[in-house]
A protein has these predicted regions:
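Active-site acidic/histidine proton-transfer and metal-coordination neighborhood
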Residues: 50, 65-164, 174, 255
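Active-site-adjacent beta->alpha loops and helix N-cap segments on the catalytic face
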Residues: 37-49, 103-104
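Generic structural signal for hydrophobic
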Residues: 22-23, 48, 81, 85, ...
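Histidine-acidic metal/acid-base catalytic patches
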Residues: 1-27, 89-91, 114, 145-167, ...
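Conserved beta-strand positions in the central sheet of alpha/beta enzyme cores
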Residues: 32, 57-59, 94, 131, ...
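Active-site-proximal loop/turn and secondary-structure-junction residues that shape catalytic pockets
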Residues: 9-11, 35-37, 60-64, 98-101, ...
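N-terminal substrate-binding region of glycoside hydrolase catalytic domains
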Residues: 20-35, 59-63
Length: 256
């Protein structure tokens, strides 16, 4: 499984380049970030080039698609993000969908589908994939998309290879559970994964989830994308990555 380190979580509030150098020296070649506008993207590009790293994902602007009145603003944010992603050699753009507006869920759902259908040609032309992200109800009260099942339905309705789901195992374990029962039948609709220990959003080696089994099953289902490590370490971040690799290796699961 190709492991991608989320620098915005494991190295929160710090300059990216030294962290990128450190994780690269420990054999981790995938790196991702949240809001690119909070970083010197030239610094990220230089570090990735120096280390032979792939920038696996960045976020687009956080503009709600639940509100059709803001769709033009969302598309403008995506138009701004695509060239940044291209400059970083990044093929995946993460999109949150916004809070519940109070309108009916049917109308908000349709607004999201319509907005993503408008966005799809931009992504197809750029050779990039947008991944939409459900979030859990506890950490993100008011957020519209909680259910992976609704997320998969949206992806099917948009009907573009350039729009997929970001399946965040941490969020979905809190919201609905049945992790592999939701992932495996829908593996072709998933463009990226995020993972953290539950509860606490700390290391994958802690908590109630058997991540070695989960990763093995995802790999066995034919997924060939990146598996994002998006957790808040309780100790040294790089040491925690080494511990994760040792845990996976001990269980016979390869992480690279």
């Amino acid at each position: 499984m190709k492991l991608s380190v989320c620098a915005s979580a494991l190295n929160i509030g710090k300059a990216p380049a030294p962290f990128m150098d450190a994780v690269a020296s420990h054999g981790f070649s995938g790196i991702e970030f949240w809001g690119w506008w909070n970083y010197d993207t030239n610094e990220i590009k230089d570090a990735a080039t120096r280390n032979g790293q792939t920038v696996t994902a960045i976020c687009t602007r956080f503009i709600p698609l639940t509100d059709p009145a803001r769709r033009e603003e969302y598309i403008a944010g995506l138009r701004e993000t695509i060239p940044v992603a291209r400059s970083l050699g990044c093929k995946t753009i993460i999109s949150q969908l916004g809070n519940d507006t109070g309108d009916t869920r049917a109308r908000q759902h349709q607004s999201i589908v319509d907005g993503l259908r408008e966005a799809a040609p931009l992504l197809e032309d750029a050779g990039m994939t947008l991944v939409i992200e459900p979030l859990n109800w506890r950490d993100h009260p008011g957020y519209y998309l909680r259910s992976a099942d609704e997320g998969f339905a949206i992806v099917r309705e948009v009907a573009s290879h350039a729009v997929r789901l970001l399946f965040d195992i941490y969020h979905q374990q809190i919201t609905e559970g049945d992790i592999l029962a939701r992932i495996l039948p829908n593996i072709s609709l998933i463009g990226h994964f995020h993972a953290a220990g539950v509860p606490g959003r700390h290391e994958l080696t802690t908590g109630e989830l058997d991540y070695a089994r989960i990763i093995e099953a995802i790999d066995g289902a034919g997924y060939n994308g990146w598996f994002g490590l998006e957790y808040f370490p309780t100790g040294d971040a790089v040491s925690s990555l080494d511990e994760l690799r040792a845990y996976l290796t001990a269980r016979g699961v390869r992480g690279e």
